[in-house]
A protein has these predicted regions:
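Short hydrophobic beta-strand element within catalytic cores of glycosyltransferases
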Residues: 241, 250-253
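Membrane-proximal helix-turn-helix segments that form the acceptor-binding/catalytic region
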Residues: 94-114
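Carbohydrate-associated surface elements
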Residues: 120, 142
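Conserved donor-binding/catalytic core segment of Leloir-type glycosyltransferases
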Residues: 154-170, 176-181, 187
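Active-site donor-binding segments of glycosyltransferases and PAPS-dependent sulfotransferases
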Residues: 1-70, 207
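Aromatic "clamp/platform" in nucleotide-sugar-dependent glycosyltransferases that forms part
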Residues: 233
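Nucleotide-activated donor-binding/catalytic signature segment of Leloir-type glycosyltransferases, i.e.
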Residues: 190, 196-219
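Conserved acidic donor-binding segment of nucleotide-sugar-dependent glycosyltransferases
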Residues: 253, 268-275, 282-289
Length: 330
């Protein structure tokens, strides 16, 4: 298993595969390697690529972000996890062309199998890169066993609405517009920009924010909140939905891309581009006790799909498939 050297304050990939590896069966023999250098600049990436080539084994799994590690590896022994195609949407011009070729087009050609974390990401990837869709397998993210059900009486007088993330796609300005005038407190996880602070003040939002939390501190934020607002405009998966589900909190999330797939019947789905629709979803959760209870009950059931043991088993089966493929190609 080949992992990137973590970027500053960005450990989502590492958290995901840490939980998966812990759930591997004891008879699975594996080695886990982390690139020596962060994925920045030509020479660092070249070193990482050569190092990966020297350490390759019978089956090689590149766990995301460092797609270029596959360049020198044996194609029939290698699989690559692609988490999303977000950077292709953000970049433009020559930078986008180079990124597309080096991170998507070439790696897809250089590996035996690809895993993605949602059907939505699979469809998106196939829009960008032509390949046999049977080469792409959907294996979802898993929910850490550290998350536990934590029932809590709903604070109907002043609910705490949890917002995870402040990046552009997390849609904080639209959320602020949507909840303006609703008695509640917006608890924001992530660093706020001056512009975002101005927007929150302009809509007279009662809010607090915190960043750089540990995993256990993030879990505590879910426990203390009354509901999750996750009206994102772009996700490859949408892990906060499942984290709120397993904790026992009702969820308002977007009706686009991977989020309906991940949420199932365990969230109130809204149009993330329509502040009024977001507002209606929040008010429905705040005002309808039976609806809240239904979402919470459905959430507990939904979260079972993403247990580490279930996800790990899917990876193990794929490793066996890649191994047999490499044996037959000799």
């Amino acid at each position: 298993m080949f992992n990137r050297k973590p970027q500053d304050a960005n450990f989502s990939v590492e958290r995901l595969f840490k939980d998966i590896v812990k759930a591997f069966p004891p008879n699975l023999i594996y080695n886990s390697y982390t690139s020596k250098f962060k994925s920045r600049g030509f020479w660092s990436r070249l070193y990482n690529t050569v190092e990966a080539f020297c350490k390759q084994g019978d089956v090689n799994h590149i766990t995301g972000d460092v797609h270029y590690l596959c360049y020198l590896m044996s194609k029939n022994k290698t699989l690559l996890t692609i988490l999303d195609c977000g950077n292709l949407k953000r970049l433009n011009g020559i930078r986008r062309t180079i990124f597309y070729f080096l991170w998507f087009w070439l790696p897809v050609k250089k590996v035996a199998m690809i895993t993605v974390i949602s059907e939505s990401t699979k469809k998106e990837l196939l829009q960008y890169v032509r390949c046999d869709e049977r080469k792409i397998r959907v294996i979802p993210c898993c929910i850490s066993d550290d998350f536990k059900p934590s029932p809590k009486a709903f604070n109907s007088s002043n609910p705490v609405l949890l917002q995870i993330g402040t990046a552009y796609n997390k849609n904080l300005p639209k959320v602020a517009e949507a909840i303006s005038g609703i008695p509640c407190h917006l608890r924001i996880i992530g660093k706020l920009s001056e512009e975002q602070i101005s927007q929150l003040l302009a809509f007279d939002i009662s809010y607090s924010s915190v960043s750089n939390l540990t995993d256990l501190e993030i879990i505590d934020e879910y426990i203390k909140c009354d509901a999750l607002i996750f009206a994102s405009t772009y996700e490859g998966f949408g892990m906060p939905i499942v984290e709120a589900n397993i904790t026992g909190r009702p969820v308002v999330t977007s009706n686009i891309l991977s989020m309906p797939e991940v949420a199932g019947n365990a969230a109130c789905l809204v149009d993330p581009y329509d502040a009024e629709d977001i507002r209606k979803g929040v008010l429905k959760i705040f005002s309808d006790e039976d609806y809240r209870k239904t979402l919470v009950a459905n959430g507990y059931q939904n979260a079972r799909r993403f247990k580490p043991a279930i996800v790990a088993e899917q990876y193990v089966e794929l490793y066996k498939e890649v191994y047999l493929l490499s044996m037959h190609s000799k």
